[in-house]
Amino acid sequence: MTEPDPRTLEALGLAEAPREHPLSYPGARPEESVLLDGDRLLPLTRRLCEDRVPVLAVGSNACPAQLRHKMAQSGVSGTIPMVKTRVFGLGVGVSAHVSPMGYVSASPFHAPGAVGELFLTWLDAAQLAVVDASEGVTVAEGAYGRAWLSASDVRVELDSGELLPGAHVYVNRRGVLHNGSGSPRPHPGERPLLASLLAGSARLRELFGETPEEFCARARGDGALCARGTRLFASEGLAMASGLERYA
């Protein structure tokens, strides 16, 4: 009898995609740099891929299962190098919009002096087109624009020590949510985020229910309701600029 492959996403506990399980957002991610090969994670033998486009993964695009889902749905190759990086000058906040996927996603903001760890994905042209479409880059009313951040603005250091001249990142066109004191609110994970947002807004509860589970169930697939939630973030004064608008 053939032994099961220990390198599959299922075997590694990384098979759950936030697109199918919104409360799992941003999704589980690897502990180290890997090569995503469809349903498997393989050792990554090189960190620089000059024939591909470097894209920082701020939210669920660092989740192998989410990437697998997006590529498989579009019939595009699911082989993607994923490199762990240290990023200087960028923070991870909360998008000022409700996604029809059923969650409130992450979005970057300008954070001089900040240092954090993010995955960088190296995408080929077809993969980049898939991710662009999934983020709404190609439509005027889409949630995100894709921005190029040069090393003079945001420094990206690969886990092998190389510094990149720059990288792309998806910036939310509606800004990010603030923490009540004028600073961007960090994304704590979907369940605690939704619980806090619902507790703080009676109008949000009217639209999406009392619990994170109700929020996800109502939001998922209902673009009109999500648009109302997005407008509510703005009308209640919860949104602020990310500081990255000039790049997108």
Segments (PLM) and residue ranges:
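Glycine-aromatic micro-motifs
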Residues: 1-248
